[in-house]
């Protein structure tokens, strides 16, 4: 009987079962090796993240990765705002610093020139009125303004015209200009005292 059992051939089904049982045993050590490699690689990557780069990223970004798009946009916006404000401030400083002194100097020059022209005009006008007052016969009590002086000059011209039209002056008065001027001045003063000046001033 023992010989029959030992010499009995092994069926193919038994061989396939034994082979299938051995294959999982072989695959289990291989999968264990692969799992160990994956764990080691994950530990290395975690250690690299916790290194200087990871610490810097966590401290600066507050949990965001250093190369994340959100952090890049924030950095660009802050840099753009800062640069724009600086350029605007620089431009305003240059415009205010370069434009205001020139405009102030121009205004000052225009004011000085206007004051000079006004002084010259006033001086020439005063000189003309002083010369006119010397020609027109005036009373000692006269304190005439410029308008009153012009009115008196107009009345004096009218008086001279009336004198020339009359035949009261003789040849002696005409020959002596000084006497004629004195008499004309006296006559004009009398004419003023009679009320003709008040009538002319009212007109």
Curated annotation (Swiss-Prot):
Gene Ontology MF terms: DNA-binding transcription factor activity, RNA polymerase II-specific; protein dimerization activity; RNA polymerase II transcription regulatory region sequence-specific DNA binding
InterPro entries: bHLH_dom (IPR011598), E-box_TF_Regulators (IPR050283), HLH_DNA-bd_sf (IPR036638), TWIST1_bHLH (IPR047093)
Pfam families: HLH
Gly residues composition-biased segments: 46-65, 80-100
GO biological process: cell differentiation; muscle organ development; negative regulation of DNA-templated transcription; rhythmic process
Its job: Acts as a transcriptional regulator. Inhibits myogenesis by sequestrating E proteins, inhibiting trans-activation by MEF2, and inhibiting DNA-binding by MYOD1 through physical interaction. This interaction probably involves the basic domains of both proteins. Also represses expression of pro-inflammatory cytokines such as TNFA and IL1B. Regulates cranial suture patterning and fusion. Activates transcription as a heterodimer with E proteins. Regulates gene expression differentially, depending on dimer composition.
Subunit structure, interactors included: Efficient DNA binding requires dimerization with another bHLH protein. Homodimer or heterodimer with E proteins such as TCF3. ID1 binds preferentially to TCF3 but does not interact efficiently with TWIST1 so ID1 levels control the amount of TCF3 available to dimerize with TWIST and thus determine the type of dimer formed.
Protein name per Swiss-Prot or TrEMBL: Twist-related protein 1
Gene name of the encoded protein: TWIST1
């Amino acid at each position: 009987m023992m010989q029959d059992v030992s010499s009995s051939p092994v069926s193919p089904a038994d061989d396939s079962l034994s082979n299938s049982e051995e294959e999982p045993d072989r695959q289990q050590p291989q999968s264990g090796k692969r799992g160990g490699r994956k764990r080691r690689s994950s530990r290395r990557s975690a250690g690299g993240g916790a290194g200087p780069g990871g610490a810097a990223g966590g401290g600066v970004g507050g949990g965001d990765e250093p190369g994340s798009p959100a952090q890049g946009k924030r950095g660009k916006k802050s840099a753009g705002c800062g640069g724009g404000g600086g350029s605007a401030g620089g431009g305003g400083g240059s415009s205010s610093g370069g434009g205001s002194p020139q405009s102030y100097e121009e205004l000052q020059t225009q004011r000085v020139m206007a004051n000079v022209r006004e002084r010259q005009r006033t001086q020439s006008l005063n000189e003309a009125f002083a010369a006119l007052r010397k020609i027109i016969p005036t009373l000692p009590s006269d304190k005439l303004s410029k308008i009153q002086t012009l009115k008196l000059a107009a009345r004096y011209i009218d008086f001279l015209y009336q004198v020339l039209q009359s035949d009261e002056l003789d040849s002696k008065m005409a020959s002596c200009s000084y006497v004629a001027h004195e008499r004309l001045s006296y006559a004009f003063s009398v004419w003023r005292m009679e009320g003709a000046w008040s009538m002319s001033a009212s007109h």
